[in-house]
Amino acid sequence: MSEQQTMSELKQQALVDINEANDERALQEVKVKYLGKKGSVSGLMKLMKDLPNEEKPAFGQKVNELRQTIQNELDERQQMLVKEKLNKQLAEETIDVSLPGRHIEIGSKHPLTRTIEEIEDLFLGLGYEIVNGYEVEQDHYNFEMLNLPKSHPARDMQDSFYITDEILLRTHTSPVQARTMESRHGQGPVKIICPGKVYRRDSDDATHSHQFTQIEGLVVDKNVKMSDLKGTLELLAKKLFGADREIRLRPSYFPFTEPSVEVDVSCFKCKGKGCNVCKHTGWIEILGAGMVHPNVLEMAGFDSSEYSGFAFGMGPDRIAMLKYGIEDIRHFYTNDVRFLDQFKAVEDRGDM
């Protein structure tokens, strides 16, 4: 039998074996049989030793062509097997579009987030800027720039988280006010609110947390009066607790304001008659406020004889607790889905 006839028969048999391979494993066995180191095509090269030298190049070329032909057929068959496997898998996994779809759980905004955004929206509408600041703050801005000297009780190590002697976790968002005023170089107006997290060395219980949120507001301009502060706070109370709410101002003391006041809102549950929410007083304390102390203005670079201002600070945690009847501040931070789902239901009713 001639070498040419041997290659022709080998090619035909290889094509038959390739077409009969029904899976990738069988196809791999065919490849090894013909193209492996000890395969049939490799065996043809052994015949070259018996050929005249002038015939060896042509014979070697034909062997390589045969190898390439078989490889091409193997590749084509491989692609066909992969396609058949995929089609079979798709046929077995046909989706019945008439079946009911899967319910996708949709979340809702956290009650604290809702409260903060509601307050922000109100003040944005009044022309305020929202300014954020550092949670790790310098003692200088957290206390000294706010008229709190080194000897003030609020600077006690038991009340604040100090990192170094001059660096601490901010105890309020007031440093944002101090930095903002300083950056204006004594030129008004300043009209900002400062939301953010603050830190106190409190023991966690139903009404206290070592970390909570705070929103403070500041207005500095010429001829700012106490009546401007009162009007702003009345608008805030009506927005948060209802249009029929009233406020009252009680004298208080804060180092950075003079005069200072505590702000109460008429009880939204008993309408001022007295209940467990307002402790039978008819009023609920919601925030502290006052006229910016002249020392604070001067330290920030403002001429206190020309400029005046008011400031206020509130805890969205407390506002949300009052508004939604939440009795424990820790619920805000435990990420209990059962608790949060209640606010999704309220949202669906359009009550929030």
Curated annotation (Swiss-Prot):
It comes from the Bacteria. Mg(2+) binds at residue 258. It is found in: Cytoplasm. GO terms for molecular function: ATP binding; catalytic activity, acting on a protein; magnesium ion binding; phenylalanine-tRNA ligase activity; transferase activity; tRNA binding. It is an enzyme of class 6 (ligase). One of its GO terms (cellular component) is cytoplasm. Coiled coil: none annotated. GO terms for biological process: phenylalanyl-tRNA aminoacylation. InterPro entries: aa-tRNA-synth_II, aa-tRNA-synth_II/BPL/LPL, Phe-tRNA-synth_IIc_asu, Phe-tRNA_ligase_II_N, Phe_tRNA_ligase_alpha1_bac, Phenylalanyl-tRNA_Synthase, tRNA-bd_arm. Belongs to the class-II aminoacyl-tRNA synthetase family. Phe-tRNA synthetase alpha subunit type 1 subfamily. This is Phenylalanine--tRNA ligase alpha subunit. It comes from Staphylococcus aureus (strain JH9).
